[in-house]
Amino acid sequence: MTMYRVDKKQYELNDQILPNDSSFQDSASFNQDKQNLEKILSEEMPNGKNADRKTGLFVFADLSDAIRLCCIMTNSRIYKVVPAEDTILFHRGDMNWIEIMNQFINDNNTLKHLAGFYWQGLKTYKPCWEMLFNKVIVSKIIIGDDSTRSNLCREYHEMAGNIERLNFYYENLIK
C-alpha cells in the first residue's frame, strides 16, 4: 500500500513516524469553530471505532493530496511511508467532508449528518483520502529540503494548483 505523510519534522529512510506529542488541535490557529467541529466528529464516531483525530497520525493515500498540503503547510516535508508490522489503521475517510463541515459551522444537525458520512467512509465528488494510523515507516523521502519544497510549490502555483500538470508529480508517481 503506497501512502504519503506530510510532516514538518525531518526523518531519515526507515525511520518510524509516530503521532506528534502535540496535536494540530492545540495550535494557536485552531479556533473555536474548528474545536466545535472536532468535538462533533468525536461525538459522532461510531461505537467500537478507536480513531483519535487529536492524537492519531494522518497519512494520505494519494501523492496529489500530499502535495497540496505540503504547499499549504510551511516548512513541511513529504515522505512515502509503509505500515510497520504492528501498525494499526484506525480509520480511512474523505477529508473533504471536514472541509464541507466548515461551511455549516453554525448548524449542528448538518454537522452531525456530515460527520456520519466521514465516519462511514463515504466519498465526495473528488475524495481526499486520509488514513489515521498509530505509526508508519519512511520508505522514501520525496520532499526532504526547503529548496525542493520551494521549487515544487512554485510550480504548483504556476500551474494554478493543477497537480496533474506538475513534472514533479509524474516523476514521483512513476518511481
Question: Where would I find each of the regions flagged by the language model?
Answer:
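Conserved NAD+-utilizing ADP-ribose enzyme module
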Residues: 1-2, 8-30, 55, 67-77, ...
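Short aromatic-glycine-(Arg/Gly/Cys) micro-motifs in beta-strand/loop hairpins
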Residues: 24-52
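Extended catalytic/binding region for NAD+/ADP-ribose chemistry, centered on the ART fold
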Residues: 47-71
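A short linear-motif detector with a strong N-terminal bias
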Residues: 36-38, 57-61, 109-111
